[in-house]
A protein has these predicted regions:
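Active-site and ligand/interface coordination hotspots across diverse enzymes
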Residues: 1-29
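Short, solvent-exposed loop/turn segments at secondary-structure junctions
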Residues: 20-21, 57-58, 112-113
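A short acidic (Asp/Glu
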Residues: 25, 62-63, 114-119, 178
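Short, surface-exposed acidic-centric catalytic microdomains
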Residues: 29-73
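Divalent-metal-activated hydrolytic enzyme cores
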Residues: 63-70, 75-91, 97, 128-193
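Short glycine-rich phosphate-binding loop at a beta-alpha junction
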Residues: 102-108
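Short, well-ordered beta-to-alpha junction loops that form the rim of enzyme active sites
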Residues: 108-112, 170
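A glycine- and small-aliphatic-rich helix-loop capping segment at beta-alpha/alpha-beta transitions
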Residues: 120-130
Length: 193
């Protein structure tokens, strides 16, 4: 039995890596210096624990990678790589859930890897990114490949599903602050009332 098992409402957030480390965002798409501080401040004030996922794109391709679409990451080798680096995180989630914790997943809107609802798609992109030769990318209703693998692993383990799947748009937060819908959900499930 956990020492903290008498604390009501234990909750944590599984967080896309770049929300706590903007240095890993594809250049020049980072929107904050260091961290998305308004989000981090909000979730810590509301009493959530945080599991920061690794940045799959940086580990897989490094910091000098091009911007890419979901289709470019949707390969057998990237999915296997994602499973391999997620395995210890799934074990951690399993332990926390077994101890009575509930959780929320926060991804990055538009990310080909870390979106949970809306990702970037471009069937034409391959090879050198020549925007003049292809139509512009579009946003589609689909998780990014890495988050899709995460959610599949959670289901395969038979773990309790996340309370919510939320997305943060870096640029929107930089321009307007945290979206009201994200704040409402985090308030709703906050361990601190």
């Amino acid at each position: 039995m956990s020492i903290l098992s008498n604390i009501p409402g234990k909750k944590f957030i599984i967080l896309a890596h770049c929300l706590l480390n903007q240095n890993t965002v594809v250049k020049p798409l980072a929107s904050h210096v260091g961290v998305v501080s308004s989000l981090i401040q909000f979730i810590t004030e509301k009493g959530y624990g945080v599991i920061q996922l690794p940045c799959p794109e940086t580990i897989y391709l490094g910091l000098r990678r091009w911007w890419m679409s979901r289709e470019q990451y949707d390969t057998v080798s990237y999915r296997e790589f994602s499973k391999r680096i997620l395995e210890p995180y799934i074990r951690l989630v399993e332990e926390l859930v077994r101890d009575g914790c509930e959780y929320i997943v926060i991804g990055v809107k538009g990310s080909p890897s870390c979106a949970v609802r809306v990702t970037t798609s471009n069937q034409c992109w391959s090879g050198e990114p020549r925007v003049d030769k292809c139509p512009p990318p579009v946003k589609i209703s689909s998780p990014g490949v890495f988050m899709e693998v995460l959610l599949e692993m959670i289901r395969r383990k038979g773990l309790k599903e996340p309370l919510e799947l939320l997305e943060i748009d870096h640029d929107e937060v930089a321009a307007k602050g945290l979206p009201d819908d994200v704040c409402r959900v985090l308030e709703k499930y906050s361990p601190i009332k």
